[in-house]
């Protein structure tokens, strides 16, 4: 028995999003295609590239995007010079910070400090007009809006401070919705859609699983969540490692918290269904009982959490380090993680999951290991 819904969740993470692209290629190799893709920030860009292309071109389009925005900083270092790699990566990140990333963003000229208050130029360091052009070339928005695969993009309303999802279920998606989902301040300016200003959804939460939880009915689903930041790590030994560890925790902490709460909600829902089943007939029609029944709908969910746990050689600049070597390594890591773990979770059927939420974490700790479903 297959799952009624195959859902792919993609976090934010800048350059780390190449790992997500590799995971998607691994899923394609295994014959898994999502029916719904939810993304935030770079995850929104990857999501649009997936949903906005026919299945046979999706990996090709992802590769083209990541090739365009990665920078060749020179020939690969020989093994005996590998100790220089962190310095080379840092130089690549400084290039991204000072001159921008081709096909993605560029520094504002004149600089923001010379812009008049209230203008778009005064609200960010960089201009994402190049990303708009890239998206409109590589993404078929007519295909997205036909709704064959559902697409949801997380952003935050700047003035209201609330999370918003642009969803093909009720919204016609265009390139500005994707830019809004990735408009992380103060680097990128808010994007105006229908008179409202939107920033990167990661300002509120970097993990879009809470949006899926609110979907009803969704009784039967396999949810593949791809995390770009790892909540677990060693104790920092210098200031650079402090900055990296703080960033990892900041952008990953809600991921585990949300999944733990979802499992607890599943357990409470099962208890609620048991209690409702023992109510006398006269009480089952009570409004409070009916409200409880609606909140305790039966769900058979398998959540696969794939995390790039490999140590970074880019340190605290890893999310804006776009050297081609690093991008390729992240992509390969994503493919390998699917290949190495899929035998442990691909055959877990809805019947085995039962009426509850189970989580499988094949890449959560180092070294890589396969972990049984919880």
Model-identified regions with their sequence ranges:
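C-terminal helical/tail subdomains of lipid-metabolizing enzymes
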Residues: 115, 122, 126, 130, ...
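Active-site-proximal substrate-binding core of FAD-dependent oxidoreductases
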Residues: 229-230, 237, 355-356, 360
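Acidic, Ser/Thr-rich peripheral helices and adjacent loops at domain boundaries
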Residues: 237-279
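Active-site gating loop/helix substructures
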Residues: 112-218, 225, 232, 237-245, ...
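Short active-site oxyanion
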Residues: 33-36, 196, 301
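Hydrophobic/aromatic beta-strand patches that form the interior of the parallel beta-sheet core
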Residues: 38, 154, 222-226, 302-306
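Patatin-like phospholipase
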Residues: 2-9, 14-125, 129, 135, ...
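Solvent-exposed loop/turn segments at secondary-structure junctions
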Residues: 15, 230-231
């Amino acid at each position: 028995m297959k799952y009624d819904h195959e859902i792919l969740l993609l976090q934010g993470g800048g350059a780390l999003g190449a790992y997500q692209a590799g995971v998607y290629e691994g899923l394609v190799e295994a014959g898994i295609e999502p029916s719904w893709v939810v993304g935030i920030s770079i995850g929104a860009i990857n999501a649009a590239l997936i949903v906005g292309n026919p299945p046979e071109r999706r990996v090709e389009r992802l590769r083209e995007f990541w090739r365009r925005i990665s920078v060749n900083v020179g020939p690969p270092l020989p093994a005996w010079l590998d100790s220089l790699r962190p310095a080379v990566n840092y130089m690549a990140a400084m290039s991204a910070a000072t001159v921008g990333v081709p096909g993605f963003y560029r520094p504002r000229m004149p600089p923001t400090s010379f812009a008049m208050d209230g203008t778009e130029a005064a609200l960010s360091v960089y201009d994402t007009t190049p990303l708009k052009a890239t998206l409109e070339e590589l993404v078929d928005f007519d295909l997205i809006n036909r709704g064959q695969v559902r697409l949801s993009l997380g952003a935050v309303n700047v003035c209201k401070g609330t999370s918003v999802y642009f969803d093909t279920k009720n919204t016609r998606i265009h390139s500005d919705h994707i830019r809004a989902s990735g408009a992380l301040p103060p680097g990128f300016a808010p994007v105006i859609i229908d008179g409202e200003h939107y920033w990167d959804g990661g300002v509120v939460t970097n993990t879009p699983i809470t949006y899926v939880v609110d979907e009803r009915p969704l009784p039967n689903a396999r949810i593949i969540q791809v995390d770009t930041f790892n909540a677990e790590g060693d104790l920092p030994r210098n200031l650079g490692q402090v900055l990296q560890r703080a960033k990892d925790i900041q952008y990953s902490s809600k991921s585990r918290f949300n999944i733990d709460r979802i499992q607890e909600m599943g357990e409470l829902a099962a208890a609620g269904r048991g209690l409702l089943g023992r109510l006398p007939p006269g009480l089952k029609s009570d409004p409070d009982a009916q409200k409880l029944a609606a909140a305790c709908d039966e769900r058979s969910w398998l959540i696969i959490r794939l995390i790039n746990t490999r140590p970074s050689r880019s340190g605290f600049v890893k999310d804006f380090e776009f050297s081609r070597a690093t991008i390729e390594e992240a992509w390969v890591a994503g493919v390998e993680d699917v290949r190495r773990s899929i035998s442990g979770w691909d055959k877990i059927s809805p019947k085995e999951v039962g009426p509850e939420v189970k989580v499988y974490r094949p890449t959560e700790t180092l070294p890589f290991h396969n972990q049984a479903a919880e």
